[in-house]
């Protein structure tokens, strides 16, 4: 979606809402009492959720567009709702003033940027963080005030630390690997 589409919707939202069915409105899942929102509940988003949930509990909300994934997450007792992160109407239902952090874990960099711009245009003033796959995206995100984490750069360091630990265990006579 383009920025013009979002502008059009924002200007005409009240008129358009009168055409929503009652069934649609009732289908909206609760998004209240949220401090952290994770957009995209694939591997990265799920990993972030699992890291944050022990501390933040139900104040963490995952957003996923794929129905099957939403159901899988709910079966695992995760608080995940089905929504399109680029849909302004969804964000109007979220109290952005109580949200402290939104984590962009969508697979498409341009969609992450679009959603970040949308959120800022809607008045979101909390923290934005994103996992990125390319170094040039880190700079682009930071230029827009988004904290960027290079997934592959950090993954390599973690992989090396893990391998080094294995090597140390193998060389340690008291290790169970021998």
Model feature map: region roles:
Residues 1-178:
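Cytosolic regulatory regions of ion transport systems
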């Amino acid at each position: 979606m383009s920025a013009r589409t979002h502008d059009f919707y924002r200007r005409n939202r009240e008129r358009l809402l009168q055409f929503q069915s009652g069934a649609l409105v009732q289908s909206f899942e609760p998004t209240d009492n949220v401090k952290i929102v994770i957009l995209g509940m694939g591997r990265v988003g799920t990993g972030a959720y699992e890291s944050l949930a022990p501390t933040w509990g139900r104040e963490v909300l995952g957003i996923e567009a794929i129905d099957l994934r939403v159901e899988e997450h709910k079966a695992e007792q995760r608080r995940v709702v089905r929504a399109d992160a680029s849909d302004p109407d969804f964000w109007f239902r979220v109290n952005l003033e109580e949200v402290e952090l939104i984590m962009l874990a969508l697979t498409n960099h341009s969609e992450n940027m679009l959603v970040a711009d949308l959120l800022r245009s809607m008045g979101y003033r909390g923290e934005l963080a994103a996992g990125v796959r390319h170094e040039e995206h880190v700079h682009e995100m930071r230029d827009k005030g988004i904290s960027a984490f290079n997934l592959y750069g950090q993954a390599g360091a973690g992989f090396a630390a893990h391998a080094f630990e294995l090597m140390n265990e193998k060389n340690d006579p008291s290790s169970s690997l021998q």
